[in-house]
């Protein structure tokens, strides 16, 4: 018992000095309120899935392509890789691409295939304004940025859309709703992971959705608050630079700066530097297995912010005696990229805990 108390003390000490070093308070909004507020913010009318899928069988995998509806006019294109075995149902991992990517990227397809080799069904979807969600196919992140610009320009708060992360998070909840209706899915064994934007959408979606049992964040853990307050917002801003430039111009500025970035985030991803920031929301994932994969020189998700998020998670996991279910790995001297070593660790994490 004494060793357990000692371990908890050192955890709190680690949390305190991590946040102190990076200048961030640990006075987070209570977890239950975060979950309720985020769910309320994203809530919208439910519609029937009206799913349609086509199946192709090879020697090594069954591939399903199709879609479901998450909203009245929102098709969610899906790609499903299923093991070719005698099993009738499988654990599932939903895996998400980054900004400008799609479910059909070679790297995403390889992850789905590697999951099937471990007896896991792999599911990928196109985020809003990506991939097949644009007629004829998206042009990298061009349509995504255009949708964000349109949302920024909206003057009617009652009809404010949130294409920057939040709307895709809602889609992920509906994809999970759909998956648990399938007879070939083990509903109590669903995992979720993603790279960059997809990883951000993962910690947002999985934090409040307890049906997601295992989580992996690849170059996605961060603190928007820390980035904003420490002049480290440029990498994240540059992923949709045109949208930020327009917002800056609308506010009378000739260049993107801290204040117009704060206003931009405040309208399009409200709460992102407070209760919906990663260090706050990541606590809600405990005690479920969580793997955080970061890189030392990540300009989009700066490492100091990722360490603040990890420290926050560590406190929550220790309070629930689940510290063995939390792990962080940092790839040295690497920029904002998913490394082969981290992808292997991700696959092993899902195999171990799912």
Features from the language model and the residues they span:
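Mobile cap/lid helix-loop segments that gate and shape the active-site cleft of serine hydrolases
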Residues: 214-281, 302, 306-310, 318-323
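Primarily recognizes the serine-hydrolase "nucleophile elbow" in alpha/beta-hydrolase
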Residues: 173-242, 271-273
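Short beta-strand element of the alpha/beta-hydrolase
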Residues: 78, 89-98
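Short beta-strand/loop motif that positions the catalytic acidic residue
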Residues: 292-294
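Acidic catalytic loop of the alpha/beta-hydrolase fold
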Residues: 297-301, 335-337
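N-terminal cap/lid segment of alpha/beta-hydrolase-fold proteins
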Residues: 43-87
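C-terminal catalytic histidine-bearing segment of alpha/beta-hydrolase fold enzymes
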Residues: 247, 310-354
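Cap/lid segment of the alpha/beta-hydrolase catalytic domain
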Residues: 99-170, 226-231
